[in-house]
Design a protein with these regions (language model features):
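N-terminal regions that are enriched for targeting/export leaders
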Residues: 1-64, 68-73
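Beta-propeller and closely related beta-sheet repeat lectin domains
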Residues: 71-74, 127-132, 193
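Residue-level detector of Asp-centered blade-edge/turn motifs that repeat once per structural unit
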Residues: 77-79, 135-138
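Entry beta-strands of beta-propeller and related beta-repeat scaffolds
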Residues: 81-83, 139-143
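Short glycine/acidic-enriched loop and turn motifs that connect beta-strands
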Residues: 89-93, 148-152
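Beta-propeller blade signature
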Residues: 98-105, 164-173
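Blade-edge beta-strand/turn elements of extracellular beta-propeller
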Residues: 107-119, 174-186
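Conserved small/polar residues in nucleotide/adenosyl-binding loops
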Residues: 187-194
Length: 194
């Protein structure tokens, strides 16, 4: 099989996955309807995110950017579609946000062509994840999420220690985001006050 045929096969297999109809499971408890297939997996991420599709730079068509998982999405019904801001976790266990949409919220979720470009706060984050969305009457969609940063009190050379804080951003189109200052809460300090 030549390179072009392999690329076509990747896209064809991807389209089968994306367009697969999701059916309810036979057993149900009368309260929750569970479906046979997850609505999003790492395999749903666009082929062109994962592969360099240029035969000159990737002659063996090896996956270049591994995706580990899609999880913990914020959801909203927006412009008549079910839209998720998905935590996409790379093989390096670092996460980024990407938008996927579906006409019915059950199947046919498709990622937008580009992941979310989230502006940094004053102190850059090493990882961001688990956004929740709220459409506000002021016309903005607000996203609250977790931002991890290197722990400044960690011993020298310890790159695994991190602090986690709430972070907030807003958008009107889910493409262009404005980062707002991280919320500050002093209530978590009460247990330590003397």
């Amino acid at each position: 099989m030549n390179f072009e045929d392999k690329v076509k096969q990747l896209f064809d297999e991807h389209e089968v996955l994306l367009s697969r109809r999701n059916e309810p499971q036979e057993k149900e408890n009368g309260i929750i309807t569970r479906y046979k297939h997850p609505i999003l997996t790492a395999a749903h991420t666009p082929v062109f995110w994962r592969y360099d599709l240029d035969e000159k730079t990737n002659p063996y068509l090896m996956e270049r950017i591994g995706m580990n998982a899609t999880l913990n999405s914020g959801a909203i019904k927006w412009n008549g579609k079910y839209v998720l801001v998905v935590r996409v976790e790379g093989a390096d266990r670092k996460s980024f946000f990407a938008v996927a949409e579906s006409p019915n919220g059950i199947d046919n979720f498709r990622f937008w062509d580009y992941p979310v470009t989230m502006p940094e706060d004053v102190i850059p984050a090493t990882n961001i994840y688990d956004m929740r969305l709220t459409a506000h009457e002021d016309g903005w969609i607000y996203g609250i999420f977790c931002a991890e940063r290197h722990d400044p009190s960690a011993p020298a050379g310890d790159l695994s220690s991190a602090t986690a804080t709430a972070a907030i951003a807003r958008t009107k189109d889910l493409k262009n985001w404005e980062r707002l200052p991280d919320p500050v809460s002093y209530t978590h300090l009460r247990a330590h006050e003397t």
